[in-house]
Amino acid sequence: MTGHPPSAAPVPHAAPTTVRDAVIDLLRQFGIDRVFGNPGSTELPMFRDFPADFQYVLGLQEAVVVGMADGYAQATGNAAVVNLHSAAGVGNAMGNLFTAFKNRTPMIVTAGQQARAILPFDPFLGATQAAEMPKPYVKWSIEPARAQDVPAAIARAYRIAMQEPRGPVFVSIPVDDWDQPADLLPPRDVSRVVRPDPAALARLGDALDAARRPAFVIGAAVERAGAWQQAVQLAERHRARVYVAPMSGRCSFPEDHPLFAGFLPAIREKIVARLDGHDLIFAFGAPAFTYHVEGFGPHVPPGATLVQLVDDPGVAAWTPEGDAVVGNLRLAALDLLARAAPPERPMPEPRAPRTRAQPPAAGERMSAAFALQTLADVRDAHDIVIEEAPSARPVMQDHLPFTQSGTFYTMDSGGLGYGMPAAVGVALAQPGRRVIGLIGDGSSLYSIQALWSAAQLRLPITFVILNNVRYAALQDFAPVFGFGPDDPVQGTDLPNLDFVALAAGMGCRGGRVSDAARLRGTLVDALRAPTPVVVEIEIA
């Protein structure tokens, strides 16, 4: 026995906080518990010891991943987190990243990068100038200078994504950063909306009050700002006809309202003709205007004044005439509604009633109008529709009305491949709600892999594919560019596609309808199914 006292047992040191720990902690602060991705080797360390309270949502191709995240973020109102595989994955995702930018969707896109130690040697899977690749279709982009800067970059990215106008942001993260030490970041409250300048808004209100026959042109930003109710109240207060802005990606006004006047085309001369007779054009949450083809002449009818209220200073800057006010649309509308009542005006004449489409004659394919009218007849007004059927959109606007907030999504970009994965994201965000993916045959093939994700997640989605065996939008548009009625339009025919077989290959039940008499029953059954179903409708 010695005279020395026994030594104390060594105290174990707590494991240092890593970049991974700090980022997961941040995501919890932001209310984010899902990551949408398609993993590669440069991303694997991010997901080691993946938290049990998080869900990884797998897409089989990166365009599907971004599309799912887009629908999810729009439906929740919070930013979605996306993880892509280095430069190749970002390249695959760029089409839907462009759409997310145009949709003003808050999204944190992360991409793996090779280890910092080998970046000087142009390594396999290394991304050269990684932060430049997604520009200009992100609000902010960075590859942090040090591993310990990654959490701060994620925090900054989230706050930028959530500031109006919202949009995607990009962070490139080297593979060896995740295990490096980093500090946890404290919670911070950063406001996301800005009230418009009171004097400028007062002048806009004066113009509305003084108008004799005002017209509202309402865009998707109204719905994104949660200003649906205020838009209705403002239109009723001013007894103004309400038109939907060209190419609007959301429904911002009930289409059964007596003041609803229909949809504006994306053609300058036709917009002017539709708005003729109004002395004030109020672009509310909308560009003035989105055009699809070249046009000439005035942007609004002669003698009419244009005023605009938007949340995007960039949109206000390029608007060719009239005064613009920039700020949060809901706060602005509340301020306008708080003004003294304007002079009494007569109610405008209501829009002519919609005509009903007729069933096809014996031996003929049914029309898109009949198919969509039948869908409208069996669909609950609360059901959510994600549409990507460009040639059928004008028909949809006549035969499939939307009357409730949060029930319609499409892409503001014109790029295909958004609709099917967005339906998956919306269904994830709205458990218990019926989601309908209304997709064209050509559109569906840009992201058909979304069916697999829907099947794996067992989501109640009814995919309605309108099969007209062609890119009908291009064939219908060809005369604008000088094609004759019998001139072939190269690359627009799509024969021999079997969407029921494609659905089965992805794990989804499917059925084909060519007989108009069977359509209603087939849709009713599909809309009751607890898991995804594909209904292929053969149309003319």
List where the protein language model places each region.
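Active-site diphosphate/adenylate-binding microenvironment
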Residues: R20-D33, N38-S41, M46-R48, P350-G432
